[in-house]
């Protein structure tokens, strides 16, 4: 069975501390909407419902009609965000969750359409390129929750190792990303990244 709209939840990971950017990335604006609003829209256009935002407890953001959840494993990085997303999706009765980092504004709904077509027999899907997996724009099966929690309790935070473990467990399928498509997974880390993207759409 492939992932379908009724079985697919979504989560925007917005809990990073944005040290290099100097301000909360989730509240940066691009083409009239905040990055948090944009990523929620992209996930919904991809057929994900419900969509949640995973954030730090002290963060405040205004995105209408979207549940916000906080990291359970505080300070444990993106893996803690994925764990919180998986837990929320499991509570909603979803079989898969599409996860998208708030600072990847080149990802469009079609990205998840391609991944959904790879989700067979309950497996999730992740893109891999020359530098490794792209774990923050991926579809995870809900049964990845136990693996995430087990690794976090052991103090392990590596997203690359987490995804590699899921691939070994045959819970994730790998989709190759051509080198000429690498621009799609660029993220905003510094103010110059934001400014460069804004100039494209000026």
Swiss-Prot record:
Mg(2+) binds at residue 103. Coiled coil: none annotated. It is found in: Cytoplasm. This is Probable molybdenum cofactor guanylyltransferase. Its EC number is 2.7.7.77. One of its GO terms (molecular function) is GTP binding. Transfers a GMP moiety from GTP to Mo-molybdopterin (Mo-MPT) cofactor (Moco or molybdenum cofactor) to form Mo-molybdopterin guanine dinucleotide (Mo-MGD) cofactor. Belongs to the MobA family. The N-terminal domain determines nucleotide recognition and specific binding, while the C-terminal domain determines the specific binding to the target protein. Its cofactor is Mg(2+). Keywords: Cytoplasm, GTP-binding, Magnesium, Metal-binding, Molybdenum cofactor biosynthesis, Nucleotide-binding, Transferase. It holds the Pfam family NTP_transf_3.
